[in-house]
Regions:
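Structural motif
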Residues: 17-23, 61-70, 143-151, 164
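Short, mixed-charge aromatic SLiMs
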Residues: 6-15, 54, 99-102, 143-145, ...
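Charged substrate- and nucleic-acid-binding regions of tRNA-handling and nucleotidyl-transfer enzymes
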Residues: 128, 132-192
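A conserved active-site cap/scaffold subdomain adjacent to cofactor or substrate pockets
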Residues: 1-57
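Short runs of predominantly hydrophobic/aromatic residues within well-ordered alpha helices
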Residues: 3, 40, 44, 68-72, ...
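Small-residue-rich helix-loop
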Residues: 40-145
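Short, hydrophobic/amphipathic alpha-helical patches that form generic packing surfaces
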Residues: 29-33, 74-80, 158-159
Length: 194
């Protein structure tokens, strides 16, 4: 909200007499609303300081502004603070994502996790490299194994991003590319074997 609008709408009579406190959760909620109200171009510009320079958790040579511009609309709806953006997209700009151990253990606890991830890997080798086609491969494997898409996404997400939460999965996989995706799946499967 613009400062002048705040000044115009302030009324001393509306001030509550009870002790004031700073509500961080409410502030973050307001901030998230402000972020979602930005245009995508404004959001990209606001994120630049967090994505370039010393604050970024990747080598600057690995950062691609065009790739971020592609994923920005998906990230914009999921962050409350701009400082959270790098952790949502780091897997796109790091050679290999750090695997969150708790996410890994949870995603691979089921006996079907590794075998279905192998099947997904094989399906990804020859499919059209578009988000819809990638999703269709995973859905087909889910049908063959009587598993819903959400369950199958967990091991795949951990393999690709290193954690269990993030932006929608298939658009970032498309951006990451076939070779990098398969390399990450292989790495997490090797971890599973060891």
């Amino acid at each position: 909200m613009p400062f002048q609008k705040i000044v115009d709408e302030f009324a001393l009579g509306s001030v509550n007499h009870s002790p004031a406190f700073f509500d961080i959760v409410k502030m973050q909620s307001f901030n998230a609303e402000y972020i979602r109200a930005m245009t995508v171009d404004e959001f990209i510009a606001a994120c630049e300081v967090w994505l370039t320079g010393e604050r970024a958790p990747w080598k600057q040579a690995n950062y691609d502004a065009k790739v971020f511009a592609e994923i920005a609309p998906l990230v914009q709806t999921r962050v409350q603070l701009l400082q959270d953006v790098p952790s949502m997209v780091d897997f796109l700009f790091c050679e290999m994502p750090a695997i969150d151990e708790a996410s890994y253990v949870k995603a691979f606890a089921a006996d079907w996790a590794a075998s279905t991830l192998i099947a997904i890997r094989e399906g990804f080798k020859n499919c059209d490299w578009k988000a819809d086609s990638l999703k269709a491969v995973v859905e087909k494997i889910g049908e063959q194994n009587s598993l819903k898409l959400g369950k199958l996404q967990a091991p795949l997400r951990v393999a690709v991003t290193g954690r269990s939460v993030g932006p929608p999965l298939f658009e970032p996989i498309e951006l990451l590319g076939r070779d990098a995706t398969i390399k990450r799946i292989d790495a997490v499967l090797a971890k599973k074997v060891s």
